Amino acid sequence: MARYEELKGKRVMITGAASGIGLATARRFAAEGAKVFIVDYNKKALEATQKEHPEFAGFSAADVSDEENVKAAFAEMDRLLGGIDVLISNAGISIRSDALNIPYAQWKKVMDINLGGMFLCAKEAGRRMKARGGGVILMTASSNGTEGHRWYADYNASKAGVILLTKTLALELAPVVRVNCVCPGYVLTPMQRAEYTDEMLAKVNEGIPMKRHAAPEEIGALYAFLASNDARYITGADIRIDGGETAGLYS
């Protein structure tokens, strides 16, 4: 599976790594020979993931919306690996609700994790990368951040914020640090499975030109490319990987 020789030995932090896109991405970078440090709020799931994948270099249980938790996770990575070369900020949540019935506490929680967590992790990584003279910051946004989707007003707004955060950081940290975000469409993750019945999934697939959900491994492959030297001139980009879902009207 390994394709990018330059990723061998790179110190990579991946948040939201106990399942879904984060876990698939961690596996991909480990296959590339990177030193993978995984982060997730679910300590039990994180420990099970680390046990299943002894090739991962280490882990830290952290709530990315808590600044002290984030600082502690980076400190642990510093202790184990001596720094960071690549951040893949992927932790996030979504809760299906119509906009007029979203409790404000839920709105704040989604924003704090999906956008606040991206900011806190990027700040810690960016400071380290700028000091050492290089690095790559990658964030998971969403096609929901590029256009309106019903029932996810808080999630959509948070992911739109991630896209603009990406562009701002890319401008501020260039040319030393590259910053990009990935905008997946529908991905068949445990989170998606929990929210959609089989009938709902089939209906969604009918509206996607490629007629299927993405596999988490396909998102991980894009992250590997964006961290590689082949992407060395790409920064400030929001890259869609959605099977053509947002290309235009499809029927």
Identify the role of each PLM range.
Residues 2-3, 147, 235-251:
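Short C-terminal tail/terminal secondary-structure segment
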Residues 88, 174, 178, 234-236:
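Short, small/polar-rich loop/turn modules that mediate ligand/substrate recognition or access, typified
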Residues 98-99, 103-108, 204:
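Substrate-binding pocket helix/loop in short-chain dehydrogenase/reductase
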Residues 122, 158, 166:
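Active-site helix of classical SDR
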Residues 127, 170-175, 232:
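Alpha-helical segment proximal to the catalytic Tyr-Lys
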Residues 142:
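Residue(s) in the substrate-gating loop at a strand-loop-helix junction
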Residues 181, 202-230, 234, 241-243:
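C-terminal helical subdomain
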